[in-house]
C-alpha cells in the first residue's frame, strides 16, 4: 500500500490542502487533483475511481472532497480505513468545512496527516493519539519564548523612559526660550541630548557624521508624519539638522513600492557576505559545454532566425594537469561547423576529434578561469527542431480581451526554469488569470505578465494559460520573450576521455552541458 498524496479539494478541483508522501512535482499533483472532478460521475455510490496510473479514494465532506491518491497496487480496504481516519481528523482541526475554514487551518491539517500517514503507509493510531501528538509542547521552546518576550518588554520600557526624558528636555527648552535665555542655555541642552541619545546604542553612524553639527530638539519629539519641524521652516539659527531629505527619499521609495517595484535596502555588505564565494571545482579538470539559442519565431508560423552557438571551455586547477588532450564525440547534425582556438592542433581535431595543443610541451592554462577551446554553430534548422513553441491567441469580446497562450515542448529536451514574458497594455490592475499550468507574476512597472514553469518533462509537454484584460490591439501582446535552460545540447557534444601527454594516470575530470537562451522571441 502506498498513499501518494492526501488532499482536500473543492468540487471544481481547486486544491485547498495537499500533503505528498512521495517525491512528486507540484505540476503533477495539481494536474491529478484538477482531473478528479471530471472522473466522478453523478449519482454513483462508489468511493474510488481508477485511471491508467493512479487510484482516487474519496469521500465528500459537505461542499468539498477528502481525497487519497494511491497507486493501483495498494490495498483498497486499507485505503478506506485510512480515509475514515482522516475524515474524523478533519472536523477536529477545521470546524468550518468550507474553503476559507480549511485554508485557515491548513498547517494543522498537514501536521495531522503526517501523524496518520508515514511514507505512504498508514500509522496504527487513533484520533485521540493524533491530537495528543500534535499538541505536545516543548519546555525549551516555552523558555525561549519567555526569554524573548522579556527582552522585548525590557527594550520597550527603555524606549518609553528615553522618550519621556526627551519630552521633559523639550518642555524645559521651551520654558527657557520664553524667558529669553535660549542663547545661553541652548547649546548645553543640545549637548545633553546627544549624550542621552548615545545611551540607546543606535548613535548616528552609517556615514551621517556629527562633526560641527548642532541639532534642534524638535527633531527628537514624536510628531505626526509629514509635519515639518520648527527648524525646517525657520531660517538659520544654526541649530538644526534638517531631516527632509530622508523623508523625501522614503516617500519616493514608497511610491515605487506602490507601483510594484521590489526595493532593496542600500546596505554595506557585511564581512560575512564578502567572504562568500562560489565553491571551487572539486575535480582537477572541468569541461563546460554550453550552447546558446538565438531564435525569432513568427506568430503566424515559420522561423525568421534559428541560430545555435556552442562553446567547449576547459578549466584546469594545477599546471601539472594541463598536459592533456581531450577526446570528444558529437552527433552528426546538419549545418554543424566547428572553429578551434589558434593554439589548438586543427589537423588532429579534424582527423581524430581530439582537442590538443599545437605544442605538446605547452600545458593548457590553469587557474579559476575557463579557457574556450572549441566553438561551433548550427545553421539551417527549421521550426520542427524548436525546443519550445508558443502560440498566442488574443480575441476581443465586448469590453474584454481574452488571451489564450499555449506551449508545446519537444521530446528531446527537459526544460528547466521556463519563463514566458507577455507584454500587456498599460493596466490599472493586474490581469485576471482564469486558467494556468504553472505560476504567474505581473510586473506592473514594465506591464509584463510572466508565466513560469519550473520543469517541463514527459509529464507536461504541453500547457496553456488564459487571462483577461480590457480591450486591446492583438499586436500589443507581442513580442513574447522566452527563457529556459536544459542539461543537454543540440550537438550532443561530450568528452569521452582524457589522454595524458606525460607518464602517469590521466587526471580526474568532470563535464557539464547546458543549453540556454540568449534571445528567444515570438514576434
UniProtKB/Swiss-Prot annotation:
Gene3D superfamilies in the cross-refs: 3.30.450.60, Mu homology domain, subdomain B
Region Disordered, residue ranges: 218-243
Record has Magnesium as a keyword: no
Membrane topology designation: Peripheral membrane protein
Entry-linked InterPro entries: AP2_Mu_C_sf, Coatomer_dsu, Longin-like_dom_sf, MHD
Entry's Gene Ontology BP terms: endoplasmic reticulum to Golgi vesicle-mediated transport; Golgi localization; protein transport; retrograde vesicle-mediated transport, Golgi to endoplasmic reticulum
Stated family: Belongs to the adaptor complexes medium subunit family. Delta-COP subfamily.
Gene Ontology CC terms, in alphabetical order: COPI vesicle coat; Golgi membrane
Subunit note: Oligomeric complex that consists of at least the alpha, beta, beta', gamma, delta, epsilon and zeta subunits.
Tree of life domain: Eukaryota
Pfam families: Adap_comp_sub
Entry function: The coatomer is a cytosolic protein complex that binds to dilysine motifs and reversibly associates with Golgi non-clathrin-coated vesicles, which further mediate biosynthetic protein transport from the ER, via the Golgi up to the trans Golgi network. Coatomer complex is required for budding from Golgi membranes, and is essential for the retrograde Golgi-to-ER transport of dilysine-tagged proteins.
PROSITE patterns: MHD
Name this protein carries in UniProt: Coatomer subunit delta-2
